[in-house]
Amino acid sequence: MLRVLFAGTPEVAVPSLRMLAKDTEHFEVVAVLTRPDAPTGRGRKIMPSPVKMAARELGLDVIECDPADECFLSALKATGAQCAAVVAYGKILRESVLEALPLGWYNLHFSLLPQWRGAAPVQRAIWAGDEVTGCSVFRITAGMDRGPVLGQSTVTIGAHENAGELLDRLAEDGAGLLAASLQALDEGVVNAVDQPAGSYDVAAKITTQDAHMRFDVPAFALDRQIRACTPAPGAWANLHPHGDDANETLHVSKAIPADMTADESPRNLKPGELHVTKHHVWVGTSTDPLELLVVKAAGKREMGAPEWARGAHLAEGAYLD
């Protein structure tokens, strides 16, 4: 039986923790390392991480000491862990920590390494228009996501799937891959493969400014941007409801390139120009219009775009930029 320390923080890490804790034939989760309690939600109430809440539910010990503190190494060694499983923990581990466990630290990364190393692999894959992505389990070394790979699994990206939906699928798929990789490690049959040298796309974190939509691009590019930025940080644009300089923020969480065969589909919209009918809201792009499906105005709840438009009192010439 492999004695495992689990390190993770957000909801996406919980399926892996549960799978390892459930498989008592092969694993003993000796402790859980997670980020400190932090302000959460609109009320900014101090809350434990999803991983910490799951660990409590499972009756597992939680290490409160920060890995950067000197006390951490002694706390780590006291667990008797042989290796560590890491899923979206959110902190860089110093070399002395990586060397403290006899079998090392292993990370579940949500891309097919070496492609999309970095903080936002799922979002970047969608934004780039990738049709296939997946999960990789690799040994953590000094370089960012560059250690030898123990195993990979692939999934097809749905044509209308957003980053949150895809990440949920990868979290479930990756939990099985992580468990299988650690079991192979324990049995001595793992085949770790060095990542090939070369230049690969880096998955930089998507900022709020990155999520600002520009409409002088094709409709398919905006569709990818919206799906990549949903649920966070959320794609947005400046709405000019009266066609003048006055503006407010409009978030868009779902849209599709317009069906140009439909009778109501508009023609010849300028980039950013809005066209509204009873059941549809379109915005012009550099190619075909983009139909807005789900939006959220400032201070309002998320709603269907036609419902929003009925209450927005849009004037002739209203536009987004």
Curated annotation (Swiss-Prot):
One of its GO terms (cellular component) is cytosol. It comes from the Bacteria. This is Methionyl-tRNA formyltransferase. Its EC number is 2.1.2.9. It comes from Bifidobacterium animalis subsp. lactis (strain AD011). InterPro entries: Fmt, Formyl_trans_C, Formyl_transf_N, Formyl_transf_N_sf, Formyl_transferase-like_C_sf, Met-tRNA-FMT_C, Met-tRNA-FMT_N. GO terms for molecular function: methionyl-tRNA formyltransferase activity. It catalyses: L-methionyl-tRNA(fMet) + (6R)-10-formyltetrahydrofolate = N-formyl-L-methionyl-tRNA(fMet) + (6S)-5,6,7,8-tetrahydrofolate + H(+).
